[in-house]
Structure formats: structure tokens, C-alpha cells
């Protein structure tokens, strides 16, 4: 634990792998941290056994947990949202925040069908100004962060002062934060990289070689770049840890759920099983909605959507990709 006493009361909403990992990190950084979740068994295990065996097995936890949402956010100066996107509409209206609380999104997707960024969804639901919103993204596989593997993340807010404040709460050995004002670019990278990872996983599931996978990742990354730049993001973000860095980690790690989902798609697994594996499968509609709204041509993403819906085979997806090379 960090010496020098507690610095902030921090709440993390969502007791899955990433929510638990970031809550434990915040606790190590010297913050008074409380984790909220719906599953009473998970919460009881965290409080009594100091582990979350369902989502983050083998990691010792130093935090408190609760199923009481009001208790979790009471007097919290920072509130981290680590929920699946589909759960936001149920949970956000129940949040009663301090008027100065900063809300930080850990969600790496766009709203399905609308393409809105998660910070936009949260801002509207909670009536928050830009100076009270931030996002965190980067190559941050939850288990590696929880095991204190050195990691770098981007903390982005339209207000750079807010990004710096949030980065300060996360400061601890082995976890490095880069403040950024490019919140649009960071969020779009986070969502779009899921598609690149799915394509990489499909190639892996088809037992294709590294040459093929590298080409597919590059072509998918090219679409990500166009989408980010057309929507006001920067090249610095795309080629930094929130863009390229996250793509590298997600496409190559056995811990990546989107990578695993791509493997399942290639092997013809039922769609329900694929959806349960990774939110990126569901959220592809958000990326395509944003692309349509901003006039960005994304043929690979469109073909991937057809593979997911069963209208196209994985082999035909490869044909489309290589026709664009």
C-alpha cells in the first residue's frame, strides 16, 4: 500500500475483471476505494476472502465491496464506470453523485446503433459538464494490471486539468498514465480496436499464419485511423498506446476476449456464445453507425458485421480484406 495516508474517496461501479483490477490499483495508490457490484456472492467473497475468483482469480484484493449503490458513491470524489454498455441505462439513473464528482469511463465501446461515445452517454444521463468527465484506455489487460505488470494507459478528458487530476489518483509503481485532451480519439480507438482484434482472432481460428494476421491487422487498423481522424481525433492518439498499443495487446494476447471471440467465429460457434465472450461483437453496430454518420467507408467492418450475423463466411471476409490491400 502507498504510504502517506488516503487521498480520495473513490468508487468503482462494476465488479468484473477490469473494474476489480482498477479498484485494487486505486487502493494501492492510496485511495479509499469501494467497489460496487450486483452479484452478492462476488461481493461477499471480496470482503471476506479478499479475492474475486469469478473474474480475477489468484489476485489478492485490498478493497471493500458493496451491493449498495448509494453507499458506494456517497462522498466519492471520483466515480469509475466499469459496466457493460447495455447496463448503463439501468444503473446511471440510480447514481446520486456529489456535485463535484469526476466520472471516469472504463468502457471500450460505442453505443450500439447510435455510435455515441460512452462519455456522451454518461454526460447526458448524469448531466455532467466536460470538466467532470474522463476516460481511461490503453493496452491494459486486467489480469496483467492486477498482477502489477508494468502498464501504460491514457487518461483523456476534454479538460486537460481533469485528465491530470484523474491521472494523479492512479499514480503507483508500475502503472503509468499519459494525460490527454483527445477524448474523442481515445474513445473511438478503444471501440474500433475491438474489430481489429476480432479479425485477428478469425485468422487465428482458421489456423492462418502470422503473415496473414499481420496483413489483416494492418488493413483493419487503416479503417480505425480513418474513423478517428474524420471524427476529430489525432494521429498522436492513433499511433500511441490508446490506439496502436491497444491493438497490439488485444490482437496478440491469449487474455483478449475479442481475440477469443474471433476464434469462435472462425470455428462456427453459436452467436450467443460469441456474444458472451466479448462485448466488441455486440458493439460493432456502434462503430458502423458512427462511420455512416461521419461518411467514413469501412468495408472490412461492414463485412465483419455480416460474418457475425451469419450472412457471410469468414473465408469471404478474408477475400474482401485482401482486395483492399
Swiss-Prot record:
Question: Matching SUPFAM superfamilies, A to Z?
Answer: 6-phosphogluconate dehydrogenase C-terminal domain-like (SSF48179), NAD(P)-binding Rossmann-fold domains (SSF51735)
Molecular-function annotations in GO: glycerol-3-phosphate dehydrogenase [NAD(P)+] activity; NAD binding
Gene Ontology CC annotations of this record: cytosol
According to UniProt, this protein's pathway is: Membrane lipid metabolism; glycerophospholipid metabolism
Signal peptide positions are: none
Location in or out of the cell: Cytoplasm
Broad EC category: oxidoreductase
Gene Ontology biological-process annotations: carbohydrate metabolic process; glycerol-3-phosphate biosynthetic process; glycerol-3-phosphate catabolic process; glycerophospholipid metabolic process; phospholipid biosynthetic process
The active site lies at 193
What are the alphabetically sorted keywords of the record?
Answer: Cytoplasm, Lipid biosynthesis, Lipid metabolism, NAD, NADP, Nucleotide-binding, Oxidoreductase, Phospholipid biosynthesis, Phospholipid metabolism
Q: What is its EC number?
A: 1.1.1.94
Q: Which residues bind sn-glycerol 3-phosphate?
A: 108, 138, 193, 246, 256-258
Per UniProt, where does NADPH bind?
17-18, 38, 108, 142, 257, 279
Catalysed reaction per UniProt?
sn-glycerol 3-phosphate + NAD(+) = dihydroxyacetone phosphate + NADH + H(+); sn-glycerol 3-phosphate + NADP(+) = dihydroxyacetone phosphate + NADPH + H(+)
A Pfam family hit: NAD_Gly3P_dh_C
Q: Which InterPro entries match?
A: 6-PGluconate_DH-like_C_sf, 6PGD_dom2, G3P_DH_NAD-dep, G3P_DH_NAD-dep_C, G3P_DH_NAD-dep_N, NAD(P)-bd_dom_sf
Q: Which family does it belong to?
A: Belongs to the NAD-dependent glycerol-3-phosphate dehydrogenase family.
| Function noted in UniProt | Catalyzes the reduction of the glycolytic intermediate dihydroxyacetone phosphate (DHAP) to sn-glycerol 3-phosphate (G3P), the key precursor for phospholipid synthesis.
Supply the name of the protein.
Glycerol-3-phosphate dehydrogenase [NAD(P)+]
Q: Which gene encodes it?
A: gpsA
Amino acid at each position: 500500500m502507498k504510504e502517506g495516508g488516503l487521498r480520495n474517496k473513490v468508487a468503482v461501479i462494476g465488479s468484473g475483471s477490469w473494474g476489480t483490477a482498477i479498484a485494487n490499483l486505486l487502493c494501492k495508490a492510496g485511495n479509499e476505494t469501494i467497489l460496487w457490484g450486483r452479484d452478492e456472492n462476488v461481493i461477499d467473497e471480496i470482503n471476506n476472502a479478499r479475492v474475486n475468483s469469478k473474474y480475477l482469480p489468484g489476485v489478492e484484493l485490498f478493497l471493500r465491496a458493496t451491493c449498495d449503490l448509494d453507499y458506494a458513491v456517497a462522498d466519492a470524489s471520483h466515480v469509475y464506470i466499469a459496466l457493460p454498455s447495455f447496463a448503463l441505462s439501468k444503473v446511471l439513473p440510480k447514481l446520486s453523485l456529489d456535485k463535484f464528482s469526476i466520472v471516469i469511463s472504463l468502457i471500450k465501446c460505442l453505443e450500439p446503433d447510435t455510435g455515441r461515445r460512452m462519455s456522451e452517454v454518461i454526460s447526458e444521463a448524469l448531466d455532467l459538464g466536460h470538466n467532470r468527465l474522463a476516460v481511461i484506455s490503453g493496452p491494459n489487460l486486467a489480469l496483467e494490471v492486477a498482477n502489477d505488470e508494468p502498464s501504460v494507459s491514457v487518461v483523456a478528458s476534454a479538460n486537460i486539468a481533469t485528465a491530470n487530476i484523474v491521472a494523479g489518483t492512479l499514480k503507483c509503481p508500475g502503472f503509468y498514465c499519459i494525460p490527454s485532451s483527445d477524448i474523442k480519439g481515445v474513445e473511438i480507438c478503444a471501440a474500433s480496436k475491438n474489430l481489429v482484434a476480432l479479425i485477428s482472432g478469425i485468422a487465428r481460428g482458421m489456423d492462418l499464419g502470422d503473415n496473414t494476421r499481420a496483413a489483416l491487422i494492418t488493413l483493419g487498423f487503416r479503417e480505425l485511423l480513418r474513423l478517428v481522424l474524420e471524427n476529430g481525433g489525432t494521429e498522436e492518439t492513433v499511433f500511441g498506446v490508446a490506439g496502436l498499443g491497444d491493438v497490439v495487446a488485444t490482437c496478440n494476447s491469449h487474455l483478449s476476449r475479442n481475440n477469443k471471440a474471433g476464434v469462435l467465429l472462425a470455428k462456427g460457434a453459436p452467436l450467443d456464445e460469441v456474444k458472451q465472450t466479448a462485448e466488441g461483437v455486440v458493439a460493432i453496430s456502434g462503430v458502423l453507425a458512427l462511420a455512416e454518420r461521419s461518411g467514413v467507408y469501412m468495408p472490412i467492418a461492414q463485412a465483419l458485421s455480416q460474418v457475425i450475423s451469419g450472412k457471410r463466411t469468414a473465408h469471404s471476409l478474408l477475400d474482401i480484406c485482401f482486395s483492399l490491400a
